[in-house]
């Protein structure tokens, strides 16, 4: 889609009374989402440049269980803010939320977690502040400490109990979003389970 077409869409839907309605993209991926599965071709600098060019107020970088691009994104956002001082970068993470399960060690010594493939729910967490980013880092560290391979795909489960342990003692620093069709809410809705 050409820039002119995207600009027209934004002008049609997000500009009211001559002023831009604040719009933030809260779920984006970069080349850092490819640490365990090739997911995205967006480069961080290009992604941020494009968002600023389109007039977005900001965006959230929410790579798949990966915080490695945050420093690069912060540095480039500072450059963008020279021209667009109101542009905001929100640091986040798309985690794979799962029920707590005990690890299982196979005969060859490999550790895995008996989680069914469909029971990894995509869940986006956005840091509101430095404490929120610390919580993201702790949750990510826990998930990576459980990394295992299932049918050729790396799995990085974040357990519900991790959220309890990390977030509940000091709440209010993260914003949670349901993510995509891989999220629990979407899966329940698509299955017709309106009760949950």
Named regions from a protein language model:
Residues 5-196:
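Phosphodiester-processing cores and adjacent nucleic acid-binding clamps
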């Amino acid at each position: 889609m050409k820039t002119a077409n995207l600009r027209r869409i934004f002008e049609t839907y997000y500009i009211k009374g001559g002023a831009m309605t604040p719009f933030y993209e809260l779920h984006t991926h970069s080349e850092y989402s490819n640490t365990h599965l090739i997911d995205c071709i967006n480069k961080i600098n290009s992604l941020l440049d494009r968002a600023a060019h389109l007039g977005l107020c900001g965006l959230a970088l929410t790579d798949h269980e990966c915080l490695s691009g945050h420093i690069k994104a912060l540095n480039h956002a500072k450059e963008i803010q020279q021209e667009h001082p109101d542009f905001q970068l929100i640091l986040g993470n798309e985690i794979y939320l799962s029920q707590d399960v005990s690890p299982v060690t196979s005969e060859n010594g490999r550790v895995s977690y008996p989680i069914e493939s469909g029971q990894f729910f995509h869940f986006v967490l956005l840091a509101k502040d430095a404490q929120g980013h610390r919580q993201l880092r702790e949750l990510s560290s826990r998930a990576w400490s459980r990394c295992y391979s299932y049918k050729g795909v790396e799995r990085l489960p974040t357990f519900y109990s991790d959220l309890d342990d990390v977030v509940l003692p000091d709440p209010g620093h993260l914003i949670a979003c349901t993510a995509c069709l891989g999220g629990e809410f979407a899966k329940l809705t698509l299955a017709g389970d309106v009760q949950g």
